[in-house]
Every structure is written in C-alpha cells, then in structure tokens.
Amino acid sequence: MDLTTTRQRRPLISDSSSSSSTKSYSKTDKPGRSNGGDAEDGGLRWFLPFIALCYLRYMSATSNIIHDCDEVFNYWEPLHYILYKSGFQTWEYSSNFALRSYLYILFHELAGRPASWWFGDDKVRVFYAVRLFLGLVSAVSDTVLVVALSRKYGKRIATYAVAMLCLTSGCFFASTSFLPSSFSMYAISLSSGLLLFEKYAMAVAVSVVGVILGWPFSILAFLPVVIYSLVKRFKQAFIAGAVTTIFLLGVSLLVDYYYYKRWTSSVLNLLIYNVLGGGESHLYGTEGALFYIRNGFNNFNFCFILAMLFVAIYPVIRRKYDRALLVVISPMYIWLAFMSLQPHKEERFLYPIYPLICVSASAVIENIPELFREKYSSRESLLVTITKYMRPVILGCILCASHSRTFALINGYSAPLEVYKLLEHHDDAGPGSVLCVGSEWHRYPSSFFVPHYISEVRWIDDGFRGLLPFPFNNTLGGTSASPPYFNNKNQASEEQYLKNIETCTFLIELQLSRPYQYRGSDLSTWEAIAVLPYLDRELSPAKYRSFFIPHMWQEKNVFGKYVALRRVPK
C-alpha cells in the first residue's frame, strides 16, 4: 500500500513580515492600565501600603505639633468637656449661634471614651489615643486610594503616591489633626479610590459624609467625583447620595437638639452664616492671593510644583490614563483657585486636596520620559533613558526636603506640648491650683494636658483685644448655654481676663529677645520648673528656619525660651 506523506512547508521570513502590521510600534502605543489592569499581579497588594501608612501615621500621632488654636478650642476642648465635664467653649458653640456640629465631636468620642475608661486620669494618653485613631482612619482611606491607583494605572504611580502620602510634610501633619478639613481629606482619598474602583455609589456616599460630617465648605472639592459618578451610574449613585444625605442631616439635627437644647442644624447655620449671613471672616486675618502657593511649596516643596504641571502635560499623556484620573485630580485646581480668592486664608483650609497633590505629582514624575520620547520612533533616545533614571532621584529629593521640613517644625515648635506635660510632676502644689496664660493663649495645647489638681486655667491680659474662649458654664446649662459674654464680632469681653494675678499658682510664658520685661523675670515671685527652646520666627531667617539642615539650623536660627513658672511660696 502506498503511503502518502504530506510535508508542511516551513514558514518563510517573508510570510511573517507580510502578515505583521506595517505601522511602527513604540511604547507610547501600549494600552493604558485603565484598559483592564495588570493581569499578572493585579497591582499592589493591600498589606504593604497599609503598613507603611500606619507606621508614618503613628509617627505623626506621637510627634505632631498643634498648628492652629482653632483645633484646640473648637474641637479638642468640646471633646474634653464631653469626656470630663470641663473645658473651654468658643462663641461658635454658644446655643445662640450653634455653628459647630457635635456629631463631628461624637465621632471622635468613639476613640476618646474607651481611652478615658482605660487610662483613667491620664488625660495625655487619651489625647494621643484619639490622634492614633485619626491616623488609622487616614491610613485606611489613603490605602484604598493607593491600591486603586496601582490596579488601574500601574505599580509605579502608586508607589510614588504612597511614598509622598507617607512623607510629605503636609500629609504628615494634616493626617492626625483634629479638624473637619482633615476629615474631608480622608473622605477625598476614600471617595477618589472608590471611583477608580468603579464603586460609584459608595464614592458618592463617602463624599456626602465628608461634607456633612466633616467640612460643609468642602462640597466644591467633591463635585467632580459626584458628577462623574452620577454620569456613570446615575440611579445607584443618586440613591446612595440622597439616602446618606437624609440620614446624616437627620442624625445631625437630633444630636444638635440634644446638646443645644433647641431645634437647629449646625451644618445649615454654618453655611448661612458664611454664605448668606455675611460672616466676617476677615476679622480673623487676611492674606494675599499667593498665600496658598507659598504654603503649598512649604508643605510639599517640588511635589507641589510638579502637581501643578499635570494639566499642562495631560494632552501628552492622555493615551496612558483614562478620564477618571483627570476627574480625581481636578478638585486640586478647583479648590486652590476658589480658596485663593477668599480674603481669609488658613493653612488648614487646603487640607482636603493634600492627597490629590501627591497623586498629581506621582503621575507627572512617572511620565517625565514621555515628554522626551519621539512620537514615531521605536528606538529609545538617550534623553528618555536618562529621564527614566531621574525619576527616583526626583522622588528622593522631594522626600528628603519633606523630611527636613517636618523635622524643622517638630524641633522648632513642639515646646508647648512638652512643657505642659511636665505640669503633672508638680501635684504637690495641691488641689485648687490656678494655671495662668497670657499672650500664649493661642498655643494652649488643650485641657487634656492640664492635670486634675489644677482647678482653673485663666487668661491674663497681655494686650490682646479679641474674644477669648470661656469655660463651659454648667450653671447656665453647659452646651445649651447662651452666655451674654459671647459675640460674633471678635470683640473682647470684660470678663475674659483674670483681674488678680496674685491668685496664679503657675504661669506659662514664651520669653523672646524683646525690649520689655516678662513676668517670669521677677525671680522673687516666680521660679522656672520647665524650660524648652522655641524657634523665634521673627528673628530667624526664612531660608534657615523652614528646612532642617544639621548644625546650620541650630547655628543660624534664634531661639526663645518656652517656660512654665511656679509661684515662689512666701
């Protein structure tokens, strides 16, 4: 029988060349990660970013200074009152005005109440327990954002982002600050991450929480995420937003009634006062249009500059990223422009967009080589190769400058917290002791640092003519009181200062090189029980005080003395 074998022809080179596309290929033609993600590794795992963020948030919680007296008097003090039935009240918490939400304070009681049971009279530990709680919330929200970035756009942009979220000075300090703007920052991170995960209903719900429970004015920063989510999944996103809004406004209304003892909404009161009621924020200081640009550079150095460039290079890199990343980053520009137009400016007002600055800068750093790539060439130029290796160098410079800035602030301005901690070692003064504070009232670190043997903290007149906080008046009703000495014009009350300084047992002073005498200079009346250096901002050159450079920082700057004094027994 004849066997017929069929031999298959070996493919020729010309066959393969003819079947392939004639169009040249370059790396810029690769589909972006937004078209399906990395099938091999699925992006970063949850564990490592979370651990890194938790570690840095722990460091922030334990070493962060208090940057603003508003944090103390409008948030730490009401929490102290809820926990211990003593603390200072500002005019915003007067029942007559009711501008502050107790629901936001109660959220922090979730950590403060168990800590007060566990640590008893050690209120300083309760303070740091609340800070650790804030750090944990920040770490969780930032982890969601980082993992979402990695799964949608790749590990590199996510790695850059987590490094800057951990170490940039702005994020380091804002992450554990007890402020509504910090809470809105957590919500911005979480809602942005959920949007990238395509969890649109959850993104809208978190946005509502950030606005109502956190800072109502931050609604402008959440608009891009909310609008994009509604476009993508209108029904689910709308229902989630509506239900969350109704629920939180209802709960807030009930909580406000419980504490203010009248039907009122602190959320609406705050908006009406500032938007419709002619809120006179200029009474508390005004700044120029470039304030936030300078502030952004101080807190993020070159990261801030790179972040601002994202919109400029987006036309070059838009094939790599889908529209979702532009939506996530856009609140940075909207918020910065809007806040720069307001006369009253505070550093904390920029907190909500801090994570977006890191994301934007990460995208720019990742794509620096793309700016130098030849469009139709498949070969990589020397300049592209060099810029690839420059990316970690740029990131390293940002992180080193950030660490230097963080270290400068902690070493320069941590004295108030540390000096007040030492008061607990002088309980031999006995119950009923009075702690007096003059011009340093705005650096008062909160009643959590005042030992139980001190019965009163009193302000003494050092020339300040604005309205100071008063202790919550339990006789008039505590949180429901409308004391007559409060006003919304920042006008000093005759009752706010202690008349007889002879009743002071302890005195807190900042002694700087100025041509006048300090009360603590009278050594026959006062003895120093704690003295720590404090950076003299006015006499220290900006180029040396802003960033910590070993040896030079100590030599070129001028320091005063932050002093706790005790009355000499007669």
Swiss-Prot record:
Membrane topology field: Multi-pass membrane protein
First and last residue of the signal peptide: none
Biased composition (Low complexity): 14-25
One GO term of the biological process aspect: dolichol-linked oligosaccharide biosynthetic process
Keyword match Cytoplasm: no
Subcellular location: Endoplasmic reticulum membrane
Swiss-Prot/TrEMBL catalytic activity: an alpha-D-Man-(1->2)-alpha-D-Man-(1->2)-alpha-D-Man-(1->3)-[alpha-D-Man-(1->3)-alpha-D-Man-(1->6)]-beta-D-Man-(1->4)-beta-D-GlcNAc-(1->4)-alpha-D-GlcNAc-diphospho-di-trans,poly-cis-dolichol + a di-trans,poly-cis-dolichyl beta-D-mannosyl phosphate = an alpha-D-Man-(1->2)-alpha-D-Man-(1->2)-alpha-D-Man-(1->3)-[alpha-D-Man-(1->2)-alpha-D-Man-(1->3)-alpha-D-Man-(1->6)]-beta-D-Man-(1->4)-beta-D-GlcNAc-(1->4)-alpha-D-GlcNAc-diphospho-di-trans,poly-cis-dolichol + a di-trans,poly-cis-dolichyl phosphate + H(+); an alpha-D-Man-(1->2)-alpha-D-Man-(1->2)-alpha-D-Man-(1->3)-[alpha-D-Man-(1->2)-alpha-D-Man-(1->3)-[alpha-D-Man-(1->6)]-alpha-D-Man-(1->6)]-beta-D-Man-(1->4)-beta-D-GlcNAc-(1->4)-alpha-D-GlcNAc-diphospho-di-trans,poly-cis-dolichol + a di-trans,poly-cis-dolichyl beta-D-mannosyl phosphate = an alpha-D-Man-(1->2)-alpha-D-Man-(1->2)-alpha-D-Man-(1->3)-[alpha-D-Man-(1->2)-alpha-D-Man-(1->3)-[alpha-D-Man-(1->2)-alpha-D-Man-(1->6)]-alpha-D-Man-(1->6)]-beta-D-Man-(1->4)-beta-D-GlcNAc-(1->4)-alpha-D-GlcNAc-diphospho-di-trans,poly-cis-dolichol + a di-trans,poly-cis-dolichyl phosphate + H(+)
Pfam families named in the record: Glyco_transf_22
Functional pathway: Protein modification; protein glycosylation
Glycosylation sites: N473
GO cellular component, one term: endoplasmic reticulum membrane
Spans annotated as Disordered: 1-37
Similarity field: Belongs to the glycosyltransferase 22 family.
Other comment: In the absence of ALG9 activity, the N-glycans transferred to proteins are aberrant, indicating that the oligosaccharyltransferase (OST) complex is substrate-tolerant.
Cited function: Mannosyltransferase that operates in the biosynthetic pathway of dolichol-linked oligosaccharides, the glycan precursors employed in protein asparagine (N)-glycosylation. The assembly of dolichol-linked oligosaccharides begins on the cytosolic side of the endoplasmic reticulum membrane and finishes in its lumen. The sequential addition of sugars to dolichol pyrophosphate produces dolichol-linked oligosaccharides containing fourteen sugars, including two GlcNAcs, nine mannoses and three glucoses.
Protein name listed in UniProt: Alpha-1,2-mannosyltransferase ALG9
Organism: Arabidopsis thaliana
